[in-house]
């Protein structure tokens, strides 16, 4: 079990410094791969459309996932509902590369997340804070991402979540060893993971940014805040020029600390996706609060 998990963590580590893009067709997947994406997320609808349509959002049709998988050579991810281990079993049977237990889809279980140790395939999970991140890792997640607020084109929540996680990690590194058990209780997280973070000053898995990233500047901002890479959902194919936007965001993640290059890649992209002021959303319409 531990050998398999170490392999899964290493697979996620190989995506570090890259961009993972949401795609809904094989054609979009090819655009993403040509632009330099390190992986794609196969979906029936991007988060902006899921948000607009409402209702219950479920795992994508296996036919769509298989078509996207056949179109590209880079890893393909797909989403399942929180707690829906049967959807995860189906995706594992399809030979998908990573499963995202995602708050963007309608939760199937409001009490329990999936036991990710029961699967051979690596899992990605969202987190708003260090406690959530360590609980998901304790369940077997090989990769963490900020939850942000998907489908809004508004990066503010992703920034908030990344800053919170980083601040809580920094705090752990200042504690004495005899204070770590109390910290584990406070975080509601496994003691061994809390101790690891305190000793190493980082999560034991990669932590990507996700949720509301709509421009190259957004992507570079998240990288400068300490993200290991970036997920872009609606920001590519809801923009005016998806091909140019995809290439620009990949370059922005690579050269995130080079303002001259960021200025160059941000030029002439056309209009970014339509955005939403998160303050105007009802509590029931917030995805990030799903899960615990």
Swiss-Prot record:
Residues that, per the record, bind D-glyceraldehyde 3-phosphate: 163
**One GO MF term attached to the UniProt entry:** pyridoxal 5'-phosphate synthase (glutamine hydrolysing) activity
- The EC number of this protein is 4.3.3.6
Keyword Lyase attributed: yes
Q: Lyase as a keyword?
A: yes
- Record-linked CDD domains: pdxS (cd04727)
According to its UniProt record, which residues of this chain constitute the active site?
79 (schiff-base intermediate with d-ribose 5-phosphate)
Recite the UniProt keywords alphabetically.
Answer: Lyase, Pyridoxal phosphate, Schiff base
Q: In which pathway does it act?
A: Cofactor biosynthesis; pyridoxal 5'-phosphate biosynthesis
Pfam families in alphabetical order: SOR_SNZ
Q: Which reaction(s) are listed as its catalytic activity?
A: aldehydo-D-ribose 5-phosphate + D-glyceraldehyde 3-phosphate + L-glutamine = pyridoxal 5'-phosphate + L-glutamate + phosphate + 3 H2O + H(+)
What family does this chain come from, according to its entry?
Answer: Belongs to the PdxS/SNZ family.
Q: Which PANTHER family match?
A: PYRIDOXAL 5'-PHOSPHATE SYNTHASE SUBUNIT SNZ1-RELATED
What function does the entry list? Catalyzes the formation of pyridoxal 5'-phosphate from ribose 5-phosphate (RBP), glyceraldehyde 3-phosphate (G3P) and ammonia. The ammonia is provided by the PdxT subunit. Can also use ribulose 5-phosphate and dihydroxyacetone phosphate as substrates, resulting from enzyme-catalyzed isomerization of RBP and G3P, respectively.
Subunit notes for this chain?
Answer: In the presence of PdxT, forms a dodecamer of heterodimers.
Protein name as it appears in the record: Pyridoxal 5'-phosphate synthase subunit PdxS
Q: What are the top taxonomic ranks of the organism?
A: Bacteria, Bacillati, Bacillota, Clostridia, Thermoanaerobacterales
């Amino acid at each position: 079990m531990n050998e398999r998990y170490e392999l899964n963590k290493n697979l996620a580590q190989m995506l570090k410094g890259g961009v993972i893009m949401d795609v809904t067709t094989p054609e979009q997947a090819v655009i993403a791969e040509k632009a330099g994406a390190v992986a794609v997320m196969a979906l029936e609808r991007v988060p902006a459309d899921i948000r607009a349509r409402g209702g219950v959002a479920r795992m994508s049709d296996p036919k769509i996932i298989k078509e996207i998988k056949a179109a590209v050579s880079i890893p393909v991810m797909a989403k399942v509902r929180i707690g829906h281990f049967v959807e995860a079993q189906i995706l594992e049977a399809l030979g998908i590369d990573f499963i995202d237990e995602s708050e963007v889809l309608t939760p199937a279980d409001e009490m329990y997340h999936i036991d990710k140790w029961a699967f051979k395939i690596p899992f990605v999970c969202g987190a708003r804070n260090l406690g959530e991140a360590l609980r998901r890792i304790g369940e077997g997640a090989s990769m963490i991402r900020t939850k942000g607020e998907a489908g809004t084109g508004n990066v503010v929540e992703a920034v908030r979540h990344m800053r919170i996680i980083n601040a809580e990690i920094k705090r752990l590194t200042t504690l004495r060893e005899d204070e770590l058990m109390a910290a584990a209780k406070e975080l509601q997280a496994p003691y061994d993971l809390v101790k690891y973070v305190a000793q190493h000053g980082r999560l034991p898995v990669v932590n990507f940014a996700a949720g509301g990233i709509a421009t190259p500047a957004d992507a570079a901002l998240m990288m400068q805040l300490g993200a290991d890479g970036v997920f872009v959902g609606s920001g590519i194919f809801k923009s005016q020029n998806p091909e140019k936007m995809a290439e620009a965001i990949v370059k922005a993640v690579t050269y995130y600390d080079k303002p001259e290059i960021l200025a160059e890649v941000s030029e002439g992209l056309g209009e970014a996706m339509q955005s939403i002021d998160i303050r105007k959303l009802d509590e029931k319409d917030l995805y990030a609060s799903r899960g615990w």
